[in-house]
Amino acid sequence: MFDKEYVFYGKHADMVRKMTAKLSDEIGRGFFGTNYEIYQVAPFVGWIYKRRAAVDKNGETTKIFPDKMMKGKQDLVFNYRNIMALHFGDKSTEEIMHIAFGLDYKDQDRKEYDEIYDSYVLGGVEEMYEQIFEKNGANSVDEYIRNLYEFIEELNMRLYGTWDDLS
């Protein structure tokens, strides 16, 4: 589990590359520094927005190398367990515990659940990309940054409600 490279394919690879690409000469990096950073955040964005997507094997690829996956394994397993618990929240506690905690070393038994997790990763990639680069017809760095700000504000509202609710 999370001990080999992860590959983004096709349109998702293109989206990940754009989110990690240098925004401009003045801004020497992208919204995300690495593919791994996107992989950490994407499943939760997918869950929050109820967005899942299938693998698109057409086109180019971009990867997260095995050493990076293994270094972050503890965090990735934590993410996986949370997404499984959220996705299967209508099941019994025993079933959730089995799915989220009982299949770590049973790759074949876990395969269908890995595919569910991956669908949230890819759905989250799509949602982040669309929110940042496509919303409001954005076509400049300033507009992308504004969209990112609005996206973060919207995430906050989806998670916590209004600012008044926080006090």
Residue ranges, per PLM feature:
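Short, basic amphipathic alpha-helical segments that act as recognition/interaction helices
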Residues: 31-57
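Charged, low-complexity intrinsically disordered terminal regions and linker tails
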Residues: 1-26, 52-167
